[in-house]
């Protein structure tokens, strides 16, 4: 019988790694508060800082903030549309070399930063391109941060081995059980190959990994793939764009019941350290549909 283990950031946190987005944000809060040309600030630092200042819960949820800006939520339109419309109303017929007082706008620092990068003739296309390019830079900064945390950790691998073995080989391994396991890893770290061996366990780092230098942030693709602005920011699009290992062969993560094959179905699904948040809705829907878990 096959088992699927799904691990989220709670696994790395349990192993003592400062891998949460909150920990990362603490390192970059200054860049959002007071950016200057030539530093390593990105527009996402400013967006998240503004969200934090307004006490919105999305400040520690980059995926939720991405969705807010490029897709919207419920009846709320995408923030990018509102932002561009307000900007056009603000500049009116002023000449292109005019000086603007950004403090009169709802997002003064965001407008100021955007104009410093792409000029003041802002439209949805140029703004979306800026958001996408800066998201890639933001991901690189996160990779650098997380790599440093791994290097500073004295016992991450030891803790990962302890918890990983407990999860893979717990008391659920009863009669009819086999060692056939798959791991859906939502983390950017990947201790599993070192712990289990390449042949023993099928591991998918669905959002990329530090080792492959393809870490991604993105919003859930559910309902968003038909939106031209939002599509490039969806996880499904970014996974394909970045060539994340195993992304096109998700069928092997979970096995449907086959009456002609004994003990091949996915009989156990274990979830550890994952919030089941909306940003990963599509993954779980696909898995649960495959095993008919309803």
What kind of region is each of these model predictions?
Residues 15, 21, 25-28, 210, ...:
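Solvent-exposed, flexible loop/coil residues
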Residues 1-18, 24, 256-294:
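SIR2/sirtuin-family catalytic core signature
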Residues 28, 196-199, 291:
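Active-site catalytic pocket residues across diverse enzymes, especially alpha/beta-hydrolases
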Residues 251-255:
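Extracellular beta-strand/beta-solenoid scaffold signature
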Residues 36-249:
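Extended, H/D-rich, highly charged conserved domains that either
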């Amino acid at each position: 019988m096959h088992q699927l283990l799904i691990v989220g950031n709670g696994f790395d946190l349990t192993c003592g790694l400062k891998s949460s987005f909150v920990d990362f944000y603490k390192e970059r809060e200054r860049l959002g508060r007071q950016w200057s040309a030539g530093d390593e600030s990105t527009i996402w630092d400013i967006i998240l800082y503004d969200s934090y200042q307004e006490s919105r819960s999305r400040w520690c949820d980059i995926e939720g903030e991405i969705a807010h800006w490029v897709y919207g939520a419920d009846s709320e339109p995408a923030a990018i549309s509102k932002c561009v419309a307000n900007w056009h109303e603000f500049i009116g017929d002023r000449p292109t070399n005019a000086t603007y007082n950004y403090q009169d706008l709802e997002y003064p620092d965001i407008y100021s930063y955007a104009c410093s990068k792409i000029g003041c003739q802002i439209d949805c296309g140029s703004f979306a391109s800026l958001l996408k390019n800066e998201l890639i830079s933001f991901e690189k900064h996160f990779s650098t941060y997380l790599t440093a945390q791994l290097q500073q950790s004295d016992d991450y691998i030891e803790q990962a081995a302890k918890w990983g073995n407990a999860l893979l080989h717990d008391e659920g391994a009863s009669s009819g059980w086999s060692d056939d396991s798959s791991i859906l890893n939502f983390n950017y770290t990947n201790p599993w190959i070192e712990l289990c061996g390449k042949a023993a366990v099928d591991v998918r780092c669905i959002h990329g990994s530090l080792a492959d230098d393809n870490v991604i942030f993105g919003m859930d693709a559910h309902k968003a793939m038909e939106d031209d602005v939002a599509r490039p920011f969806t996880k499904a699009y970014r996974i394909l764009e970045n060539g994340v290992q195993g992304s096109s062969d998700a069928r092997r993560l979970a096995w449907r019941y086959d009456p002609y094959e004994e003990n091949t179905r996915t009989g156990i699904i274990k979830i550890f350290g994952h919030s089941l948040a909306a940003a990963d809705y599509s993954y779980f829907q696909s898995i649960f549909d495959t095993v008919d878990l309803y």
